[in-house]
Amino acid sequence: AVNHKDIFPPNEKMMYMSGRALHPISINVAAKLQNEFNGKLDISFSAGADCFNLPKIIACGIKPVTVCSDLLKPGGYGRQLQYLEELAAAIRAEKADNIDSFILKFAECSCNKVEKAALLNLRRYAGAAPTNSAYHKESKTGESIKTSRALPEFDCVRAPCIGTCPAGQDIPSYMYYTAKGDYKKAYEVIMRQNPLPSVLGMVCDHQCQHKCTRANYDSSLLIREIKRFIANRNADRPNLKPEKANGKKVAIVGAGPSGLSAAYFLALEGFAVEIFETKAFAGGMVSDAIPSFRLTADAINRDVEYIKNLGVKISYDQKIDRQRFDELRRDNDYVYIAIGAQGAKKMGIPGEDAAGVIDQLVFLSDVRQERNPKIGPNVAIIGGGNSAMDAARTALRLVGDSGRVRVVYRRTRAEMPADLEEVKALLDEGIEVLELHQPLEIVVAGGKVAGMKCQKMQLGEKGPDGRRKPVPIKGAIVDVPCETVIEAIGQDVILDFIGASDLETDPVTGMTRIRNVFAGGDAVRGASTIVKAVGDGQRVALNIIAQAGKELDIGPAAIKKGMNAAQFMVKSARRVKGIKLPEIDVKLRKGFATVIRDLNEAEARKEAERCLYCNDVCNVCVSVCPNRANFTYYVRPGDYLVQKAINKKGKFRIETERTMRLTQDVQVLNIGDFCNECGNCTTFCPTAGDPYKNKPKFYLTDHSFKEEANAFRISGKVLKARVDGHEYMLEEKDDALHYHDGPMHARLHRDSFEVIAVEPRGEKPAAYSFELALKMAILYTSLKNAAFNH
């Protein structure tokens, strides 16, 4: 295939195609060959075979079937069991008793000739495979589940969906309770981190789904839709009970998602909270700019009322100028600036002030508030983000069957910043995208829009954001007929009561340069997503709570699922197809009815059951290693003291540097003798790290151990370590652990690993850290009974 990715160097013209994408091509090559030879060839097949298509391949008379790509994915060799199960189920379904009779019955052939029946099956399958959505690019969610999180030596397990969610939503836990049918518990889990479950259950951009581990198996979980199901099932739940009033007051400027989020967490902890909103309603851009076919008024009102019922006061129609801002600072202990980005960007081209040119915020607000905006039958939407998609789909519903709506974008669809889901909905509804079109001028006649001139573009070199920059094609100017132009190229924050320099915030706490004044959401980020705004509100609230000497625990819940590591691994070796996004038929999308319907109970539970609970056990690197070089071992969770020896006039005093906390019993190491450093574990590890490099690396022989600058070797009751070429040793004897380094020997307690005594050798250092000794003690104790200890 043509090298169009960033994996191989640019000078490489071609790249290797394998797996799923290759399957329809290869099965058609097999069909062509068998047609030429009347089905008499013996064909060995290896091209995207998996547990689901194996029965069809066997029915085509093709064998042996060899597998590579599928077994290099999470689940690894454990996936093979499902191959046999699916094949056995297919044979039983045909009531066949061997492969030959299966081929005959699958073909529904009365000829009783296996060779002829197999060829018939192959022709049919080859014809159907290219149109099977399982082999289309759109069926894959995202490119990788890797995140920016570092990979530590110990305690690396964290579900990538949680780490990707700006609100830190404990997704695996509410999946677990949903699958069990305990919707009350699922709701409680959601509300620990997310005060807007109804809103985010409908319109969250759900980046968590792009990092769902299931994406490497079949399809990501419908996380957002399950949240929506749980929110709806708990619509009448009584409010949480806040802590008693703590005497602290907080003023929040803006009743959008960020302000509402902060108010929720603060109210729970007993703060007196008042929100000051410029509009006559709460919700900010959520209530004013998202079309009702995506977000219902009921969902918004439900979340807002829940927060108000905690004692939060919302004052509407409030103009905040410098004087009022100073009053808020004086009358409250803390102020949170949480305004949205409510100014639409302009293109700066001729004709932009003509009648018929509308910005997307005004247009979407007019429609949402039922002000019935007047637009022409031909509408051009300029932009490629989610707001542009919303504006285009809304305009389509207004112009009717006789109108035409087109999106004008200066790059290609592949570079659009809009969510893939939103782009797909746009295309499904029949809206055309004019790619590589840069607006130059809005044609005006009689003061009104009469069309638009666009420069045709082509993609050039990549810019800092990774997208290829559009460059003009000389002389290629085209006319785009339209009577209405809706600009959707971005939004600005309009903030006149505080200076830009004062708005600079601490990236951790959210505090501005003004003491006890915080800012977050669009006010700091610029126009961004709802869930990021919610996350900012949560973060600021927690920091205000901490400043006030309080504490609110919103961390993930620890749930005992009654499964051991082996059972988690078995679950993670099975592919389970998910349900498709439950959208209503395109023919029914003429009005503003909700496009994505609610999941029913059976759908929600079935989908939630697909969760792999990778916040409990991950072991992806273990399963994807074809050489079995990544190895699972177990430690004793607990708090361990990292100690150091301080030389005081020739005598050593033991002090504690810090505490090393291990919370996870399942850990991973790498066996260097087995590892060829192929990097497959790096590809699928949800962190930014390389398991074969970052995990403790053990060697099985003294020879291989001594060849490495950084390594471990366990043999009997001795563990050796090499760090940058220097060798250390830990030995178990006399009911203790003895640590040996050149200048320092020490005796460690066998259970707590605390230093009992030190024995300096030679020149006494001023200080000596026993951090490596502690790590070696943990590793030795955990591995002394391992199979590779000899």
Task: State each model region's role.
Residues Q318-V335, A445-I477:
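Conserved beta-strand-loop-beta-strand element in the redox core of flavoprotein oxidoreductases
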Residues K56-Y83:
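Glycine-rich phosphate-binding active-site loops on the catalytic face of alpha/beta enzymes
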Residues Q169-A179, Y187, N216, S220-R224, ...:
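Beta1-alpha1 glycine-rich phosphate/pyrophosphate-binding loop at the start
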Residues M14, G78, Q82, R92-K244, ...:
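Ferredoxin-type iron-sulfur electron-transfer modules and their immediate structural context
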Residues A1-G39, P74-E85, R92:
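Glycine/Thr-rich beta-alpha phosphate-binding loop at enzyme active sites
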Residues L41-L54, Q318-K319:
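Glycine-rich beta-to-alpha transition loops that act as phosphate-gripper elements at the mouths
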Residues I252-E274, S315-D326, G343-K345, L361-L420, ...:
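Rossmann-like dinucleotide/flavin-binding elements
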Residues K137-S139, K146-P152, L221-I223, K227-A245, ...:
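Flanking helices and flexible, charged tails adjoining ferredoxin-like Fe-S electron-transfer domains
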